[in-house]
UniProtKB/Swiss-Prot annotation:
Its main location: cytoplasm. Disulfide bonds: none annotated. Keywords: Cytoplasm. InterPro entries: RecX_HTH_1st, RecX_HTH_2nd, RecX_HTH_3rd, Regulatory_RecX, WH-like_DNA-bd_sf. Modulates RecA activity. Transmembrane segments: none annotated. It is found in: Cytoplasm. This is Regulatory protein RecX. Belongs to the RecX family. Coiled coil: none annotated. The gene is recX. HAMAP family: RecX. GO terms for cellular component: cytoplasm.
Amino acid sequence: MKITKIEKKKRLYLIELDNDESLYVTEDTIVRFMLSKDKVLDNDQLEDMKHFAQLSYGKNLALYFLSFQQRSNKQVADYLRKHEIEEHIIPDIITQLQEEQWIDDTKLADTYIRQNQLNGDKGPQVLKQKLLQKGIASHDIDPILSQTDFSQLAQKVSQKLFDKYQEKLPPKALKDKITQALLTKGFSYDLAKHSLNHLNFDQDNQEIENLLDKELDKQYRKLSRKYDGYTLKQKLYQALYRKGYNSDDINCKLRNYL
């Protein structure tokens, strides 16, 4: 087969053959196989060229994808599939990228966890789940998590939550709120409870009473639209108790309120 035309098309070259076949190749392919117009290729040379062209094009795609941020092996492979790189070539591309240190799942996991320590608010359980979703294996994640101390981060997150809710909730509800938030963010129960020891939950009676008054007004506006009488009183009691207020304080307020 003879090459009848070579034409540059943006980042690729269009090659046309005298058997009416055409294909796109990278500049690396042109150089490697010393392609030029009127060059004759046998079947083996043509297949070698096609394979290398796919490999070269796929690698260029992957490098473009990696230029924005670190990616896992799986993320790169999925990206190549999306761009219709042949399945049997993808492992070769991944291997080359690994050998040249463009991709490394262990380093990616380490960087992700370190960045979270500096700027994030996630505990180890959520971090692991997010890394698994990126296609990183547990054996690349677990050693890094086990060597990472999350106690200071848990304290930092708990302090931020404390500052946000301390003027809105009584001590018991505030503790529950912070604990549940930390659990949701992936911290262990022990770490969540330990982080509370660094916070001052002391509130004087007047502060608690003011909070109770505000919450009672809020719940009354909401519940009085649907209930009245004894049922309203019960609903108010239940709502306030769930918020963490003392039972005696609630009953006292309700006697004077209704």
